[in-house]
Amino acid sequence: MTESVDQYDQVATAFADVEAVISFVRENLEWPSFKDLLGDLRGRRVLDVGCGEGSFTRRIKQLGAAQVVGTDLSPGMIALARQAEARNPQGIAYEVQDLASMPHQGEFDVVTAIHVLHYADTRETMQTMAKTMHANLKPGGRLVVLSANADSSEESETAAGFRTYRPENPREGDKFKVAVRTTPPTEIEVHHWPTTTIVDVLHTAGFTNVDWSLVKPSDSVAPADRERAARCAKNPTSLTITATKP
């Protein structure tokens, strides 16, 4: 997954601009929807795969998790995460690891994956990623995923601050670009994976109780932002998936 390493090292250099654009959908839809599924993390061990610069990782630790480990294949993103940890120490360990080839990190109570699975270039790669997440959970542990919605609408993308350029009638694994509306635009290449495929991959990896739902606006969205949040929620750009290791 070298291409993902290269492009996210490039994104790391313009991260502040990207963060400013995507913060609306993250704060008003993605994080609230994701947080609701995490449950009580007090005293829990959490592995956050594909942690990027650690935005969600730090929030997870602040929810009371006893141990949090963040991994990402991009050295640039991990450098940003470690810088944030140095500025405000929370006891989070960050490691450069590719989920598709990551060695066993331990048995965690919860594994989280935020916008990771759409970087799988083949179904086999995604299957390996799913097996790795499964292997790093203790029996009864939970997987909580935030992933791209393959059926997102142009209206929701525009409101969220980016645009996807999928091929017409995309097939599983087809590559396409996402252009974040920074100046100049920041382009990221990802792959098309229908939700049904992701669910099937998780079942094949050994997960049970696999369930998914579209992200939705938080009840605490400011009145002035509700119209934009409603547009973001029309076939939104993201969805959540939960699963359990028996």
Residue ranges and their predicted role:
Residues 1-41, 55, 59:
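Conserved class I S-adenosyl-L-methionine
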Residues 35-47, 139, 143:
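Mobile, glycine- and charge-enriched loop segments
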Residues 47-49, 53-101:
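Class I SAM-dependent methyltransferase SAM/SAH-binding core
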Residues 103-111:
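A short acidic, Gly/Pro-enriched loop at the edge of an enzyme's catalytic core
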Residues 110-124:
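A short SAM/SAH-binding and catalytic strip from SAM-dependent methyltransferases
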Residues 127-139:
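A short glycine-rich, Lys/Arg-flanked "PGG" loop and its adjoining helix->strand segment in the class I
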Residues 144-201:
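SAM-dependent methyltransferase
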Residues 201-246:
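C-terminal lobe and adjacent flexible extensions of AdoMet/dcAdoMet transferase-like proteins
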